[in-house]
Amino acid sequence: MHRELIRDGLLVTLAGRYKEDPVQFVTLSKQTLDSAVAREAVAELRNEGYVEEQVRGVIRLTPRGYRAYRNEPLPYAYKN
């Protein structure tokens, strides 16, 4: 559950930046970099082709990642 929240949070942040400027990279906070779960989420997104990593902790959404984000609503977006 915690991993999904981190992954979804990254996607929301990156999608917002992508809409503003698709070539802009985002620098992750030290707290995020220190989290093994967050690093795993970034690696997962990178391996899926959704995120490009310039150097460790500096990432941006790829066009593929942005399309996937727009086409698949986040799980907590559904109302019960």
Regions inferred by a protein language model and the residue ranges of each:
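Alpha-solenoid repeat scaffolds
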Residues: 20-21, 52, 75
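Short amphipathic alpha-helical interaction segments
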Residues: 2, 31-47
